[in-house]
Amino acid sequence: MKIAEVDLLKESTYQTPCGTIHYWSSILSLDTTTLVFLPGLTADHRLFDKQVAYFDGKYNIIVWDAPAHASSWPFRFDFDLFDKAKWLNGILEKEEIIKPIIIGQSMGGYVGQAYAQLYPDRLAGFISIDSAPLQRNYVTAVEIWLLKRMEPVY
């Protein structure tokens, strides 16, 4: 695959009961830290082109087209967030990646949080870009109270 005018990533696939997930990787060695980029809803792997170009040669890189997005289409819509996290784990196992740093944008951040919840010992780090926390313990009672009383902004 060509990104930022440089051939950086190898395209691979991962089969699920709902369809095929397409992902791209650049694996330097299994001892190198791996960055996993997860784009948000309606975005595809190209969202992270600049980051991939910057980190190439310094880190292992994996980026996917999320289930039912771009190259990962067609895809049956009978899955949930935790299925996505399990499939991500399957991809990481297939690539023999241990302790990645997951970088998720919007919906990709939710997948990263679900992965962290299911596999806390298999994660080196998590970076969220425009994703709200999934777990209640990250939101204060005051924030919940305020959110329930806000007028719609539309």
Predicted feature locations:
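Short, well-ordered alpha-helices that flank and scaffold nucleotide-derived cofactor binding pockets
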Residues: 50-53, 57, 90, 117-121
